[in-house]
Amino acid sequence: MTERSLNNLILASSSKRRIALLKQINIEPGLILPADIDEAPLKKELPKDYSIRMAKSKAEKIQSSNPNYFVLGVDTVVACGRRILLKAENVEQAEKCIRLLSGRRHRVYTSVCLLTPDQSKQHIRTVVTIVKFKRLSEQEIKYYLASEEWKNRAGGCNIQGLAGVFVLFLRGSYSSVIGLPLHETYCLLSNYFNFNLY
């Protein structure tokens, strides 16, 4: 298989966390283009299915206007049971999320979709990570909400910041919870691109 330059790769996201995670393994896409798509879940859609659909939709949206590129779409979903916790749009929604997760296990689904040029091939990987938060005090909830770290975060959670102290245990991929499963992403891209980890 011909190895290509990373200039032929588009990341369908403007997430600073995902860009930083890719740089961590020496991957710098040629282009970074956020995909504007409808992110509303379908009726009775399960969290894993939603994550896959979003990652695929982001990649397809960007590739529709850039057909000669490889496109990487990624989506992270926080779920409590079958309930999908979307990005909080205001402090009231953030409070509902953080109270729901307090003292409970939840799952974080991150799906990665790699489309080859003209969508000739489609590769999808989904990583599921189980996270349990401690039971939060009213003061902890108050301080976390005041920090505004919940903004633009799936489920209002930012375990790279203050919410990191809420985590009793994490079973799975830490990088996936942040926004990109590094192992799975590396395996997908190394089939097509020439880059060095060291």
Curated annotation (Swiss-Prot):
A GO biological process held by the record: nucleotide metabolic process
Residues under site feature: Important for substrate specificity: 17, 76, 160
GO function term, MF aspect, one: UTP diphosphatase activity
GO CC entries: cytoplasm
Family of this protein: Belongs to the Maf family. YhdE subfamily.
Reactions the enzyme catalyzes: dTTP + H2O = dTMP + diphosphate + H(+); UTP + H2O = UMP + diphosphate + H(+)
EC number(s) per entry: 3.6.1.9
Active site (record annotation): 75 (proton acceptor)
Subcellular location field: Cytoplasm
Annotated protein name in UniProt: dTTP/UTP pyrophosphatase
Keywords of this entry: Cytoplasm, Hydrolase, Nucleotide metabolism
Cofactor(s), by name: a divalent metal cation
Xref: SUPFAM superfamilies: ITPase-like
Free-text function comment from the UniProt entry: Nucleoside triphosphate pyrophosphatase that hydrolyzes dTTP and UTP. May have a dual role in cell division arrest and in preventing the incorporation of modified nucleotides into cellular nucleic acids.
EC class: hydrolase
Chief localisation class: cytoplasm
Xref: CDD domains: Maf
Domain of life of the organism encoding this protein: Bacteria
A Pfam family: Maf
Gene source species: Wolbachia sp. subsp. Drosophila simulans (strain wRi)
